[in-house]
Regions:
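A short glycine-rich, hydrophobically flanked beta-strand micro-motif that places a catalytic Asp/Glu
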Residues: 37-41, 165-171, 233-237, 303-314
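Short, charge-patterned binding micro-sites
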Residues: 40-58, 315-319
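Internal helix-turn-beta structural module
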Residues: 46, 304-306, 313-398
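Glycine-rich anion/phosphate-binding loop at the beta-strand->alpha-helix junction
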Residues: 196-298
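Glycine-rich, mobile lid/loop segments that gate access to catalytic sites or pores
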Residues: 6, 66, 73-244, 371, ...
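N-terminal, positively charged regions that mediate nucleic acid binding
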Residues: 1-40, 45
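Conserved phosphate/anionic-ligand binding catalytic regions in large, soluble enzymes, centered on
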Residues: 8-10, 14-19, 115-130, 244-269, ...
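Alpha-helical support elements that line or immediately flank enzyme active sites
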Residues: 12-31, 129-150, 278-302
Length: 398
């Protein structure tokens, strides 16, 4: 029997994502000037105010205020009427040095034996539903949000858009787990004041269906995904009505509160650890990336149509406690899931330092992951320019 499955995404202007982006921008700034920096940076955003908290060990000083303000303005919070404006919001820093107890437990004479920065379990997931091996419901929800932000920043169409928005996509699956059709699309977007509420709702709905969705479909190159779009999709556009008050003024935002949006949209599993603001010595982030790297490559190689990989660590210990694999009965090789896990253990070095080297996680690459998902991204080389507290500028290919 067929079933329905939903995933949501949020825009870069969602308050929790504003916090994530500030935290990762600060992390990148540290890594640009000190690749050995240890960073655990949390951000809190609310009406007219940002608080930056956490623990850092680094040989460099960075201008937290400028980084936070530039991030907020890039997102689009540039008007006083939003009650949260990158030019005028208050910014308080409560950053302090990382615990010496943790440093002693993690650092080793032999760098390769660097211990995990914490205990925990991390998951990676992949499916062959899409070209980037992500669940199609989440992939579409992200695409809707990133395209809406693109339209907003162009400033030519849907000129009433404000930065905060959310999407949700419900997909119908066959009983053998094949996507069949899109059942429902939900889009809620912050907007300017309208003279009349009924006019507002009608206009936004019309523009979502006639401007946003055609552009979204135009970006999809996979015919199997395009076939999911039928004439019977149910659209819910701003279903609560007026959405003028939004962003950090409407809801307080915190780093690390969108971990399902950041990963697999409810598919697979999640170990509970957030990513943004953490350098790669924190296995919450680096091992989750490694688990995804393994799952994706296993599915891409045809080992299974779908795979979940779990890795767990003890603080201060380099090698993982376990590797677990679940192929959901969709394996294409004559091996049990346990045998696949044993093979993975031999093929991949999952010590934290080895993960850093393999995935190049000591580069300032994290700001790009802080909105629209950490997984399923297209590899690219990008030039990034950083300016130090002493006005020294450097450009890095990452």
């Amino acid at each position: 029997m067929s079933y329905l499955f939903s995933s949501e995404s949020v825009s870069e202007g969602h308050p929790d994502k504003v916090a994530d982006q500030i935290s990762d921008a600060i992390l990148d700034q540290f890594l640009a000037y000190d690749e050995k920096a240890r960073v655990a940076c949390e951000s809190f955003v609310t009406t007219g105010q940002v608080v930056i908290m956490g623990e850092v060990s680094s040989r460099v000083y960075i201008d937290l205020q400028t980084i936070a303000r530039n991030t907020i303005k890039r997102i689009g919070y540039t008007k006083a009427e939003y009650q949260f404006d990158g030019n005028s919001c208050g910014i308080l820093s409560a950053i302090h040095e990382q615990s010496g107890d943790i440093n002693r437990g993690v650092d080793r004479e032999n760098e390769d034996e660097q211990g995990a920065g914490d205990q925990g379990m991390m998951f990676g997931y992949a499916t062959n539903e899409t070209d980037n091996y992500m669940p199609v419901s989440l992939d579409l929800a992200h695409l809707i949000m990133s395209t809406l932000a693109e339209i907003r920043k162009e400033g030519k169409l849907m000129t009433y858009l404000r930065p905060d928005s959310k999407s949700q996509v419900t997909v119908q699956y066959s009983d053998d787990n094949i996507p069949e059709r899109i059942d429902t699309i939900v889009v809620s977007t912050q907007h300017d004041e309208f003279a009349d509420d009924d006019t507002m709702l009608a206009k936004i709905r019309e523009d979502v269906i006639n401007i946003l969705m055609p552009r979204v479909k135009g970006k999809i190159t996979n015919d199997n995904v395009l076939k999911l779009f039928g004439d019977d999709i149910k659209y819910y556009v701003n279903p609560t009505g007026k959405f003028v008050i939004g962003g950090p003024h409407g809801d307080t935002g915190l780093t690390g509160r969108k971990i399902i949006v950041d990963t697999y949209g409810g598919k697979g599993a999640h170990g509970g650890g957030a990513f943004s603001g953490k350098d790669s010595s924190k296995v919450d982030r680096s091992a989750a990336y490694a688990a995804r790297h393994i799952a994706k490559n296993m599915v891409a190689a045809g080992v299974a149509d779908e795979m979940l990989v779990q890795i767990s660590y003890a603080i201060g210990v380099a090698r993982p406690m376990n590797i677990y694999v679940n192929t959901y009965g969709r394996s294409n090789v004559d091996m049990t899931d346990g045998e696949i896990a044993k093979k993975i253990e031999k093929l991949f070095d999952l010590r934290p330092k080895a993960i850093e080297r393999t995935l190049k996680l000591r580069q300032p690459i994290f700001s790009e992951t802080a909105a629209y998902g950490h997984m399923g991204r297209k590899p690219e080389i990008k030039k990034k320019t950083f300016t130090s507290h002493y006005h020294e500028t450097k450009t890095i290919d990452v």
